[in-house]
Curated annotation (Swiss-Prot):
Protein name per Swiss-Prot or TrEMBL: Legumin K
Domain (Cupin type-1): residue spans on this chain: 182-329
Species this chain originates from: Pisum sativum (Garden pea)
Gene name in the database record: LEGK
Compositional bias segments (type: Basic and acidic residues): 104-118, 141-150, 160-170
Region of interest (Disordered), ranges: 37-86, 102-170
Molecular-function GO terms, alphabetical: nutrient reservoir activity
Family membership noted in the UniProt record: Belongs to the 11S seed storage protein (globulins) family.
Amino acid sequence: IPYWTYNHGDEPLVAISLLDTSNIANQLDSTPRVFYLGGNPETEFPETQEEQQGRHRQKHSYPVGRRSGHHQQEEESEEQNEGNSVLSGVSSEFLAQTFNTEEDTAKRLRSPRDERSQIVRVEGGLRIINPKGKEEEEEKEQSHSHSHREEEEEEEEDEEKQRSEERKNGLEETICSAKIRENIADAAGADLYNPRAGRIRTANSLTLPVLRYLRLSAEYVRLYRNGIYAPHWNINANSLLYVIRGEGRVRIVNFQGDAVFDNKVRKGQLVVVPQNFVVAEQAGEEEGLEYVVFKTNDRAAVSHVQQVLRATPAEVLANAFGLRQRQVTELKLSGNRGPLVHPQSQSQSH
């Protein structure tokens, strides 16, 4: 979950972060991983990351006779990976299409050759709209007065739940009569919809309770021609993308800002996306792209870069990415209407 910290005091602030790699939400290994949306951060865990990079280079080393065939791809990769933030692994052209911004704004989002690391000094202080102290006190008093009633209601609900559980058999009602089929391709039940870009529907343990026993969920995505599913990542699940119809391009960036996958995909192909890797999909110009994503968590949670930037205070974005006020407004509001994007319709509205 993205967050930022600002020291508004007169003394240096020392913060200690505890990373629980054994948490059930972590479906990777015990290596601590931290990724940044902006800036050019320094490596925080060099020992473990150097070991991983060594294995990666050894695994992807090519014979001399094949080396020239990957020359152009390596140059493009070096051009993309100019910074260490996750957005540095995405081309500025694609970011401009996704966020409906000018090319210069998209380049700044990638933080190329930014000499600043994790900590950025804010000149003149950070001005953010906050609730007044009096309002906070009133809210606290109101919440305290309601707490007693809420406790009584919770006790009554617990008693009723206990009585109902005593009457249930459990086995027949959870297994034998469980709903085991769901049409996630049904357009009428779409969770997200853009008439120009496409639609998305998710099946998890909330909509299909039997998935709780399998610890799986699924996401159906249909992108119309040139439609984009903007950059996003799974907070608590690995995922397997399977193309059903059409063709398009999939871009994947790891936590170090490296573009680990940027290729075209077509019907019948599989792509594995590890937990917390940023991924974006775009349909081709000739036909759309239809695929399903299987996730290793029955309630997989997704974060979208667009929504994160829109919820971040303007002053924070301006200082983190070195943007002007006009660029911040453009980034937060212009065309930022959801994770499904159509570049042509965005530019027309702009």
